[in-house]
């Protein structure tokens, strides 16, 4: 019998991890940014849930990044937003509450990775997209 979920880890430049979890009984992909230390302890989670269409947009943004253009990827069930900015060969990733966008504050957690690491993240997103039915 296959596992009820699949997870993958993407290690970033600042010792943070983008952690992806797909559960077969849910119609979305969970995305979390946490420190590698928190990953071992399973604490410090900042979570956002993305539907398939949003994951497709995120994958396309990573594979063909528009320079200095902000990508907003909204959670479909809460007010969380995943924000990605590509600038000077780096991708900067934040998770925050939608209301914080108006206030220009309230970032819950953030990380970054280089353009040369992007193909690995694209591979992970493609694997996760294949799990959606």
Where in the sequence are the language-model features?
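Positively charged, low-complexity terminal tracts
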Residues: 1-133
């Amino acid at each position: 019998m296959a596992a009820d979920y699949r997870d993958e880890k993407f290690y970033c430049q600042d010792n943070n991890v983008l952690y992806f979890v797909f559960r077969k009984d849910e119609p979305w992909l969970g995305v979390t940014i946490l420190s590698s230390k928190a990953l071992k302890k399973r604490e410090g989670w900042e979570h956002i849930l993305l539907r398939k269409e949003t994951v497709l947009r995120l994958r396309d943004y990573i594979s063909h990044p528009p320079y200095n253009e902000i990508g907003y990827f909204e959670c479909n069930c809460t007010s969380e937003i995943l924000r990605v900015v590509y600038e000077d060969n780096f991708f900067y990733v934040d998770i925050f509450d939608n209301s914080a966008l108006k206030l220009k504050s309230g970032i819950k957690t953030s990380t970054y990775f280089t353009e040369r690491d992007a193909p690995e993240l694209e591979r992970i997103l493609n694997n996760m997209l294949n799990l959606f039915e």
